[in-house]
């Protein structure tokens, strides 16, 4: 294909436009006073055209960082204007709209990958053309601006002449059909490079058509002259004609410009130099331009380092500018010593063409903010970056500031990306030069205004969300800024550190704030159970075994204020009216002695570490151990074991602060033994012995003293300094322990009922009577607890005791009386009659069932009637709700089913089932005490083989998930604390997942591909690693060495790929997904009761989800208003950019998105919904072109956004009446103007 003629009209029009662009670079860099003076020197017609064109080119000039100030010499700008006039540009100037359609679109984008090869090949072509034209003579016109009559006007057919445009008539400005070179919409620029005329040797003849390397016998062709009737200059123009035209400028300017011979691009070999050749002079004189180029900032290299332009006389004025659509690059001359620009060294072969590399340092942190689904979870060592940020920047990239020393080849080597992103979002006007690598920054102009606005916004958010005090403190710490002089340090987020320390230690962060409380009414017990149950639902601990220890029980009542524990972060959550107080506060003295001189040292950190796990503290106080090796030999009979379970259930979460034993040597040894066996679980409490030989607890609980007189009347001596309780006059076990000597070491195996201690007038409660009747009916001849221990040992030697057989169903008689007896024995345990229990230890080997109840005992002190069902007496008329059998066999949690049934039912929660329960096993759910019913459902004893059906793992994630899914009734919610299932459920479920985008690493031998989409990963493997040309293929996937035929190899590869999936980590859920987006949707709709939006943590009271929080709709589509996972492409691979490379944004760049969003007093959910409307979807940063699939709803907004690097899309100014999006977000690019996409 023949090379295009550089003397053609299209080529010269292009060069004229580039000269005008060079003029605008100097004009844009001039200050305002210089621009005003230039306006006074230019005629009105030309000035109007220049200003209209400048308005279009100004965004591009701003994107090139051409700042005001470097050019103060008006003579330089005037000289450039004269050169434009001398070329005849204003005779038929192209429409200024063409710049916005072609020139800007090509200059601001990357070129094609083969440009460098074309540049080298084209340089050789120019050398050949220059050599061949040295011997050629061209007749040119003389300086009187009249065409030379000796010029041959006939078209020349020579291969070296302009055979196409030699006889063309002058262009008509009004007719675009006669001027195809000016119709930029239809013009396709040549995909070749043109050497600037300024770099042609001065002794060469006029520019001629390039000689194609394939053309032979060039010597046989004779070159004719090139006349001046080409381009847009008419052949009949005279000096008087030009001076009479207002648009061409004053006669003085024209005449002064025509007095400089010797600088024309067209010269002859004769001594006569045509003065009119200055009309086509493409380079300014050395005398006038040298000094101005040293101060020019039109090029980034010259702006950064002016010393590089020492040889500016030989520099290319169009250096660094090239077209993308035409692949035409204006390269510097062969003799130029100027450095190559970033366009020449940028490795465009490795950059994905649809991904924009134009990213300014001012918006680095903001791009990180918008490239993540939850920006607060990005790690400093591995942030989730925008794909555009994967372009590696070298050292000294920025103009100034502290960041440039930290760019060691990659942006991800920067110090703290979390702080950078948060600082950028809080201070939109903060320039990048004020940021420092450690996350600190220097004060800027609007620092105080933005600090005040952020504080005001934060307080409004706290009031709207009704956050707990700890959450408020955490938010204020995250948004705080410490100022030291001019340096500002954002306060560190200590939430993660506190969570890590709390999860690894047994601190007070997880203890319930409680107070020592005593009551004599059943109503008090009901309130106690209700408040304590709220805490039990939050805990998830391992199953525990019991060794009974005798101790006087002081009832620990949780505070009536709202409190709950976040089991994920192990942080105590409270409402605003609650003050945290641990169960075991510091003692009055640093060291106090236990009985017989057992020292106990108190340390705040140790106390916090011990009191975090309340279950373990209670276990240590009761002698409960988690392993069989640590458990001492059993010395209890069946009866006492059953009683021990009741005490465990009622006091497992309570701290036993005093005991009944006398200070005998045996009891002291027992206390020492407990501390020796499990020192980590024994609370460091402070005991003292008074004159009555009563061991009291001196631990300071730092809680207010109960105001009720009945509560304080139980204290025997009225000593308010110690939380001591004397032995009551009557005890349920007084018949079994007639004297104090009987309360020896074995007395630790006896539990004192909480109800019996707190019951007024020593009245035996129904629970106590049940236990006592069972006790007396089992063995009426028992005299002491030592005899009971011997009977327990015999029962253990003989195998499984009666109670264990009764529970496991191994020794159930076939007659009706045996079944009724077994059901009667099990009913108190399952239905919650004994007490509000968290765990029921069935046998030594049978696992623990975690369950919960929401009901209170009837507020009455009178005795309830009993049904005589053998030896066990159970209160009458207790109603039970039986869960459906189909629900039993399902895998969904119990709370989900109850939620579907209705919100007025009580809930069993925290039950982890690994296998399906038998359909014949109904489970009874207790209702409120006020809802009496005559129905009483029985429990089928045949289905009680819990060894096969119930998992031993109680600490599974499903327990925490199902714990707070209950939808409580209004009546049940009144005495309970407020549950926040949003934070409780969502954070637990989503903390299990990997954050960010998925990564799929190719396991093929020698392949290092790492993709972020399973679809792209499958394409990569099937296309790259499946050689279809071979008949037999060997599999090199990981350790697979199979050799298969080519037609079977694809199915074999797909078998490997099917194993790469994202599995749902929720227990009993076996679904797998190919990307995080589908997995999130699965969790939202299958395992969570509401939508997951990480930006808004709204209080959900009583399980009722607010509709506006659940569904946030989009103005253009029907999608939810959440941020989706849009990392759907592979990361582009890019080599390091040159040292002088600088990121250039597209026209209309503006980085103050958050500042605009927060200017109006919008609520938090509205801001998030507004972000969802602004193209933050899969077309983020130009991930695919406009021909990709559109949205499901059929709208084209997602695919038709103008993005940098996409061909064929131009931005045109339109009137405000045209309905266009008011704000477009293209990754880090924000365009505020009304635009129209074509």
From Swiss-Prot:
A GO molecular function assigned to this protein is: zinc ion binding
Q: Basic and acidic residues: which segments have biased composition?
A: 785-796
Region feature Disordered, mapped onto this chain: 133-156, 196-237, 277-303, 546-568, 696-735, 784-824
- Which portions of this protein are annotated as coiled-coil regions? none
Q: Where is the composition biased (Low complexity)?
A: 224-237, 702-723
Q: Which GO terms describe its biological process?
A: chromatin organization; pericentric heterochromatin formation; rDNA heterochromatin formation; silent mating-type cassette heterochromatin formation; subtelomeric heterochromatin formation
Question: Which intervals carry biased composition (Polar residues)?
Answer: 214-223, 291-303, 810-819
Q: What does this protein do?
A: Regulates silencing of the mat2 and mat3 loci. Organizes the chromatin structure of the mating-type region where it also participates in establishing the 'cold spot' for recombination. Required for proper positioning of nucleosomes at heterochromatic loci and for transcriptional gene silencing (TGS) function of the Snf2/Hdac-containing repressor complex (SHREC).
Query: This chain belongs to which protein, by name?
Result: Cryptic loci regulator protein 1
According to its UniProt entry, this protein's organism is Schizosaccharomyces pombe (strain 972 / ATCC 24843) (Fission yeast)
- What is the gene name? clr1
């Amino acid at each position: 294909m023949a090379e295009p003629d550089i003397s053609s009209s299209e080529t010269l029009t292009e060069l004229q436009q580039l000269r005008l662009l060079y003029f605008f670079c100097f004009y844009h860099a001039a200050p305002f006073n210089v621009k005003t003076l230039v306006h006074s020197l230019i005629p009105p017609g030309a000035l109007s055209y220049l200003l209209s064109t400048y308005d279009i080119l100004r965004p591009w000039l701003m994107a090139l960082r051409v700042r005001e100030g470097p050019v103060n010499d008006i003579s330089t700008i005037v000289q450039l204007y004269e050169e434009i006039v001398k070329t005849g540009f204003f005779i038929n100037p192209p429409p200024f709209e063409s710049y916005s359609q072609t020139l800007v679109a090509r200059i601001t984008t990357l070129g094609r990958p083969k440009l460098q090869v074309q540049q080298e090949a084209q340089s050789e072509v120019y050398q050949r053309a220059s050599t061949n034209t040295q011997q050629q003579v061209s007749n040119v016109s003389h300086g009187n601006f009249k065409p030379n009559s000796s010029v041959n006007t006939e078209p020349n057919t020579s291969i070296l002449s302009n055979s196409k445009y030699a006889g063309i008539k002058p262009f008509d400005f009004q007719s675009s059909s006669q001027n195809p070179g000016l119709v930029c919409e239809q013009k396709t620029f040549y995909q070749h490079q043109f050497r600037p005329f300024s770099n042609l040797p001065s002794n060469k003849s006029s520019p001629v058509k390039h000689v194609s390397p394939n053309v032979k016998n060039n010597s046989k062709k004779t070159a004719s002259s090139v006349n001046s009737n080409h381009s847009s200059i008419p052949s009949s123009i005279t000096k008087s004609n030009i001076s009479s035209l207002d648009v061409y400028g004053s006669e003085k300017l024209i005449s002064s410009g025509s007095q400089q011979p010797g600088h024309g691009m067209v010269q002859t070999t004769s001594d006569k130099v045509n003065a009119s050749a200055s009309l086509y002079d493409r380079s300014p004189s050395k005398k006038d331009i040298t000094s101005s180029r040293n101060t020019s900032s039109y090029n980034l290299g010259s702006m950064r380092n002016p010393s590089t332009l020492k040889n500016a006389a030989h520099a290319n004025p169009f250096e660094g500018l090239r077209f993308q659509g035409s692949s035409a690059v204006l390269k510097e001359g062969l003799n130029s010593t100027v450095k190559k620009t970033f366009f020449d060294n940028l490795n465009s072969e490795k950059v994905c063409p649809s991904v924009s590399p134009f990213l300014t340092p001012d918006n680095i942190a903001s791009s990180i903010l918008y490239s993540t689904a939850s920006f607060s979870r990005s790690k400093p060592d591995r942030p989730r970056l925008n794909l555009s940020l994967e372009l590696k920047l070298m050292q000294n990239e920025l103009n100034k500031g502290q960041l440039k020393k930290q760019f060691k080849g990659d942006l991800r080597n920067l110090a703290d990306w979390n702080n950078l992103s948060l600082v950028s979002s809080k201070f939109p006007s903060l320039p990048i030069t004020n940021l420092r690598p450690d996350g600190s920054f220097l004060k800027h102009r609007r620092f105080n205004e933005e600090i005040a606005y952020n504080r005001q916004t934060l307080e409004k958010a706290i009031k709207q969300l009704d956050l707990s005090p700890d959450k408020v403190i955490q938010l204020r710490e995250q948004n705080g800024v410490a100022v030291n002089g001019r340096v500002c340090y954002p306060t560190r987020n200590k939430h993660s550190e506190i969570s890590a320390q709390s999860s690894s230690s047994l601190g007070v962060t997880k203890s319930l704030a409680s107070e020592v409380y005593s009551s004599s009414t059943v109503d008090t017990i009901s309130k106690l159970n209700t408040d304590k149950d709220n805490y039990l639902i939050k805990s998830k601990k391992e199953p525990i075994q019991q060794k009974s220890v005798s101790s006087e029980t002081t009832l620990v009542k949780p505070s009536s204020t709202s409190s709950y524990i976040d089991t994920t972060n192990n942080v105590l959550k409270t409402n605003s009216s609650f003050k945290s107080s641990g169960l075991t506060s510091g003692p009055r003295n640093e060291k106090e002695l236990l009985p017989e001189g057992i020292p106990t040292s108190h340390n705040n950190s140790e106390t916090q570490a011990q009191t975090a796990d309340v279950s373990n503290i209670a276990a240590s106080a009761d002698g409960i151990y988690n392993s069989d090796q640590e458990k001492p030999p059993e010395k209890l009979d069946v009866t006492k074991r059953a009683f021990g379970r009741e005490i465990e259930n009622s006091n497992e979460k309570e701290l036993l602060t005093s005991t009944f034993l006398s200070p005998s040597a045996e009891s002291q040894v027992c206390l020492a033994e407990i501390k020796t066996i499990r020192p980590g679980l024994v609370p460091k409490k402070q005991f003292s012995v008074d004159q009555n030989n009563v061991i009291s607890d001196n631990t300071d609980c730092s809680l207010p003293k109960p105001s009720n007189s009945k509560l304080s009347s139980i204290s025997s001596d009225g000593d308010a300094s110690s939380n001591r309780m004397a032995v009551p006059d009557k005890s349920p076990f007084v018949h079994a322990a007639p004297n104090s000597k009987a309360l020896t070491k074995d007395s630790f195996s006896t539990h004192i009922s909480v109800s019996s201690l707190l019951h007024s007038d020593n009245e035996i409660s129904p629970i106590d009577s049940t236990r006592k009747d069972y006790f007396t009916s089992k063995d009426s001849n028992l005299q002491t607890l030592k005899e009971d221990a011997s009977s327990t040992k015999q029962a253990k030697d003989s195998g499984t005791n009666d109670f264990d057989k009764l529970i496991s169903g191994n020794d159930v008689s076939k007659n009706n009386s045996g079944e009724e007896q077994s059901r009667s024995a099990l009913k108190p345990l399952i239905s919650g009659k004994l007490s509000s229990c968290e765990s029921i230890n069935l046998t030594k080997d049978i696992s623990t069932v975690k369950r919960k109840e929401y009901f209170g005992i009837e507020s009455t002190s009178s005795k309830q009637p009993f049904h005589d069902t053998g030896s066990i007496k159970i209160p009458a008329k207790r109603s039970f709700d039986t869960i459906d059998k189909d629900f039993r066999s399902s895998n969904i949690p119990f709370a989900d089913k109850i939620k579907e049934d209705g919100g007025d039912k009580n809930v069993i929660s925290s039950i982890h089932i690994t296998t399906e329960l038998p359909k014949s096993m109904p489970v009874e759910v207790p209702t409120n005490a006020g809802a009496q019913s005559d129905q009483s459902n029985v429990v089928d004893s045949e289905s009680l083989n819990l060894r096969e059906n119930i998992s031993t793992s109680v600490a599974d994630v499903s327990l925490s998930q199902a714990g707070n899914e209950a939808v409580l009734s209004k009546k049940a919610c009144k005495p309970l604390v407020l549950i926040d299932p949003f934070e409780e459920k969502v954070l637990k479920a989503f903390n299990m997942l990997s954050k960010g985008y998925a990564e799929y690493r190719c396991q093929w031998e020698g392949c290092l591909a790492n993709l972020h989409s399973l679809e792209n990963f499958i394409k990569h493997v099937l296309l790259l690693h499946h050689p279809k040309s071979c008949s037999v293929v060997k599999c090199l996937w990981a350790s697979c060495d199979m050799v298969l035929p080519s037609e079977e190899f694809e199915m074999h590869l797909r078998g490997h790929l099917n194993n790469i999936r994202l599995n749902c980590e929720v227990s009993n859920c076996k679904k797998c997904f190919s990307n995080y987006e589908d997995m999130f949707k699965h969790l939202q709709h299958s395992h969570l009761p509401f939508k997951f939006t990480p930006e808004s943590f709204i209080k959900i009271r009583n399980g009722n989800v607010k509709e506006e929080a659940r569904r946030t709709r989009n103005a253009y589509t029907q999608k939810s208003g959440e941020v989706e996972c849009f990392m759907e492409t592979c990361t582009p691979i890019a080599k390091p950019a040159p040292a002088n490379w600088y990121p250039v944004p597209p026209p209309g760049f503006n980085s103050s998105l958050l500042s605009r969003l927060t200017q109006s007093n919008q609520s938090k959910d509205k801001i998030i919904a507004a972000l969802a409307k602004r193209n933050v979807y899969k077309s983020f940063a130009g991930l695919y072109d406009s021909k990709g699939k559109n949205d499901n709803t059929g709208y084209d907004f997602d695919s038709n956004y103008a993005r940098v690097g996409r061909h064929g899309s131009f931005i045109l100014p339109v009137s405000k009446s045209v309905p266009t999006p008011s704000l477009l977000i293209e990754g880090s690019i924000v365009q505020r103007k009304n635009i129209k996409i074509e």
